[in-house]
């Protein structure tokens, strides 16, 4: 069972009584056939639920009102099978607070050249019915997505499925609670921000709990629970000699297990699905949570270090969006560069906390080594390299008057040499279009040093995320040129200034 099983998407057909009962009967019949086929053949993450025809303002308003009140409804897919005068939709759309997708399709794929008549034309009017619906959306400044294609087309299926992921993610975000264990890393700017504005814009709440509250739960974990989790470690990872039974770091592994169990219990009891820690606020914990954080991220929790609640929330959001897709999603940081003409590379990592969902190894190494900051005992961590191939890194920043999402498309590559003295998980990539352009654009746009790294999601997913939340997006990819990028930032400043 996944998070998508908790939601459904309503399929709404727009028409009108002008065409008579027989036409509406055929419209309903077609809709039932299309919904059944999409549910069985399209591999959609959510179930489509067909709703009664929307043929009058009252019917349409009732559908939209019911969608708002139904917690299982993640959004609406609307198909204008016939012409549906858009003034009928104004009241409904004005109150709708769920994501909206217009599926611009028709029942038949090919025209029946020899038999087409006006009855056929009146029944199959998506071509201009969809334009009428599009006008009222534009007139009302209604955020909605559009997918064009025949309902049997696999590309249309993929695009509808991607939109469903966004719709479910938006509903989950409205309920998301972010727990900060301690505050931000002192004097750091980009990890701070306006939590009230974030809750108004996205819906997630951010609050702080003293590390001592967590420590109480950690200290209450039983030895039996620790032993059971250690057994799981033994079967899931390759333990170094120091971390095995009788190894000189075995107790550190046990303490890491205690912290993991305590953190998970605390998060579950509080209904949290994202959290932060900071190495400057560990009072009462024996080590910086490393292994615990890595494993919790793999279970779907959002996380970021140094109190970075925006990145923690973004990671949770992207984890939900990518549920069931191939490839992983992780907290990440641009750590250091490899400058070589024609082969500039970025080595991404963090002190400890990289999610094993992006690991290339089936069984990562579990090790305990010294950590030079934090002033605590040596922490346990998983060490691995990252899968290769196309990926993205994304950052959500607070500009005071708005949020900006930055996305850099990257190509993850195999590490050309072993890293015998680097005791942390890492990812190596080429930034698009090249490192100088990508880094300069990122810096000019104010991108954070913390990011969410994903093999599972792509630029289209993040564009749709920005659209569905009505936030600015700045894209850095192979098409990026710095003069045009700077111009886009200036234009955005004016555009969003007028939107205030």
Curated annotation (Swiss-Prot):
A Pfam family per the record: AraA_N
Cofactor: Mn(2+)
Keywords: Arabinose catabolism, Carbohydrate metabolism, Isomerase, Manganese, Metal-binding
InterPro entries named among the record's database cross-references: Ara_Isoase_C (IPR024664), AraA_central (IPR055390), AraA_N (IPR055389), AraA_N_sf (IPR038583), Fuc/Ara_isomerase_C (IPR004216), Fucose_isomerase_N/cen_sf (IPR009015), Lara_isomerase (IPR003762)
Assembly description: Homohexamer.
Main function: Catalyzes the conversion of L-arabinose to L-ribulose.
Family: Belongs to the arabinose isomerase family.
Protein name: L-arabinose isomerase
Organism expressing this protein natively: Salmonella dublin (strain CT_02021853)
Gene, per the UniProt record: araA
């Amino acid at each position: 069972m996944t998070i998508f099983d908790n939601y459904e998407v309503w399929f709404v057909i727009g028409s009108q009584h002008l065409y008579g009962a027989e036409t509406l009967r055929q419209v309903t019949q077609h809709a039932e056939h299309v919904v059944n086929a999409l549910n069985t053949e399209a591999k959609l993450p959510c179930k489509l639920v067909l709703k009664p025809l929307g043929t009058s303002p009252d019917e349409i308003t009732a559908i939209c009102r019911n969608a708002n009140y139904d917690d299982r409804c993640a959004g609406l897919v609307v198909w204008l099978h016939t012409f549906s005068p858009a003034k009928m939709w104004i009241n409904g759309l004005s109150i709708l607070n769920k994501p909206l997708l217009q599926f611009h399709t028709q029942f038949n794929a090919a025209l029946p050249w020899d038999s087409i008549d006006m009855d056929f034309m009146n029944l199959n009017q998506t071509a201009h019915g969809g334009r009428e619906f599009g006008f009222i959306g534009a007139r009302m400044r209604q955020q909605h997505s559009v997918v064009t294609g025949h309902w049997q087309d696999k590309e249309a299926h993929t695009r509808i499925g991607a939109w469903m992921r966004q719709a479910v993610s938006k509903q989950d975000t409205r309920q998301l609670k972010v727990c900060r264990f301690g505050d931000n890393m002192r004097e750091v700017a980009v990890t701070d921000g306006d939590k009230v504005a974030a809750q108004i814009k996205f819906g997630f709440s951010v609050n702080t709990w003293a590390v001592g509250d967590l420590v109480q739960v950690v200290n209450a974990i039983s030895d039996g629970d620790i032993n059971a989790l250690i057994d799981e470690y033994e079967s899931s990872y390759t333990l170094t000699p120091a971390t095995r039974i009788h190894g000189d770091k075995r107790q550190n592994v046990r303490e890491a297990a205690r912290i993991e169990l305590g953190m998970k219990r605390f998060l579950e009891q509080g209904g949290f699905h994202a959290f932060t820690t900071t190495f400057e606020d560990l009072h009462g914990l024996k080590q910086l949570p490393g292994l615990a954080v890595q494993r919790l991220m793999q279970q779907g929790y959002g996380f970021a270090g140094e109190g970075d609640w925006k990145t923690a929330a973004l990671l949770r959001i992207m984890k939900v969006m990518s549920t069931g897709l191939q490839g992983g999603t992780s907290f990440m940081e641009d750590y250091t560069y490899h400058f070589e003409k024609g082969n500039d590379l970025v080595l991404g990592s963090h002190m400890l906390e990289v999610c094993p969902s992006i690991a290339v190894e089936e069984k990562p190494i579990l090790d305990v080594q010294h950590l030079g900051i934090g002033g605590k005992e040596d922490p346990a961590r998983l060490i691995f390299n990252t899968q290769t191939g196309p990926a993205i890194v994304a950052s959500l920043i607070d500009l005071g008057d708005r949020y900006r999402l930055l996305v850099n498309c990257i190509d993850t590559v195999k590490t050309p040499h072993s890293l015998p003295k680097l005791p942390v998980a890492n990812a190596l990539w080429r930034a698009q279009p090249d490192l100088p352009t990508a880094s300069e654009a990122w810096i000019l746009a104010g991108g954070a040093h913390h990011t969410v790294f994903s093999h599972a999601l792509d630029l289209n997913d993040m564009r749709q995320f920005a659209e569905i939340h009505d936030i600015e997006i700045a894209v850095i990819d192979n098409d990026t040129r710095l003069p045009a990028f700077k111009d886009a930032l200036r234009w955005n400043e004016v555009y969003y200034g007028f939107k205030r």
